C-alpha cells in the first residue's frame, strides 16, 4: 500500500558548511528516492538551528547591517531546501524517474507577548564554552543555554 511519509531531518545532521551539507544530503537522497520509487509520497521537514546561527554570525561585522532572525531563518530554509531539492532531483534523474520536487519556505506567526520568550528553550547557532557564552550574553543580551552536553549556544 502506497503511503504519504513525513521524513524529518535534524539541522545538526546537515553539516557545518555548504560543501559538507551537499555531500550529506546527496547520501540522504538515496533512501528518500528509494521510497519515491516504491510509489510513496514524501514530505521532508528539516531543522535549521545551526544554520540560522551560522548565517547570523556571518553578519557579525560592524560594516554590515545585522540580519534579523526571521530573515536568517528564511535564508537557511532556502539554501537547505535548495540542496535537498537538487540532490533528490539528481538521484531521481540517475534512476530515470521523472518526479517533481519542490521546496517551500515557511513562516511562523508568534505572539510577541508570549511568556515563552522570557525562557527560550531551542538554542540555535554555534556551540561555545561556558566562559565564551557568558561573554556573548553579557555583550549582546542573548540568552545562552547549555545544549545536550555539546556546549552553550
Regions found by a protein language model. Give the residues of each.
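N-terminal glycine-/serine-/threonine-rich phosphate-binding loop
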Residues: 1-50, 54-60, 72
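Ligand-binding beta-strand-loop-alpha-helix segment within the catalytic cores
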Residues: 62-153
